[in-house]
């Protein structure tokens, strides 16, 4: 009876580990700075979003309503992330895109709110951008990249090098 109880306990412990977030390998990014350097260089909200994986309030970011033609780049390292033709109004309160410039995006999984979500990061500096959801426009990719304005800078098409 003791052995059966012990086996049941071990099985339940192993089962609980199934949903636990596993330790991740440390990735080396092309752009590396100390936390102090990021904090000194970035505006407060950009630092909070990019470096601490925060989220700005819905409808508070200036790029949510931007309709200009151009490129959205990482506010931390200026890597091109999104083209304006892929931006659409999702009604979520954050800039939304149906796709990005894949070579510059990193897809990760986070469990910060208790269930898995696809986190989007800049592949050059590791900055947190937002999350990807599969509730985007069906006529294109079906994806919604829900991105914090504070994580982006916008470069108008007529200023692109």
Give the location of each predicted region.
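Sec-dependent signal peptide cleavage junction
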Residues: 17-37
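Positively charged n-region of N-terminal signal peptides that target proteins for export
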Residues: 1-5
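A short Gly-Trp-Pro
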Residues: 29-30, 39-73, 79-161
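C-terminal motif of bacterial Sec signal peptides marking the signal peptidase cleavage site
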Residues: 13-15
């Amino acid at each position: 009876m003791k052995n059966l109880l012990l086996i049941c306990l071990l099985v339940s412990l192993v089962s609980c580990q199934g949903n636990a977030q596993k330790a991740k390998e440390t990735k080396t990014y092309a752009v590396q700075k100390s936390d102090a350097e990021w904090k000194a260089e970035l505006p407060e909200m950009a630092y909070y979003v990019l470096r601490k994986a925060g989220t700005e309030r819905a409808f508070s970011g200036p790029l949510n309503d931007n309709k200009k033609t151009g490129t959205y780049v990482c506010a931390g390292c200026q890597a091109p992330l999104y083209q304006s033709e892929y931006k659409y109004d999702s009604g979520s309160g954050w800039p939304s895109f149906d796709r990005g410039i894949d070579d510059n995006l990193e897809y990760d999984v986070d469990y910060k709110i208790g269930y898995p979500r696809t986190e989007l990061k800049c592949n050059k500096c590791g900055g947190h951008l937002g999350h990807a959801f599969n509730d985007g426009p069906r006529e294109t990719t079906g994806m919604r990249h829900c991105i914090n304005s504070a994580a982006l800078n916008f470069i108008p098409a007529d200023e692109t090098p």
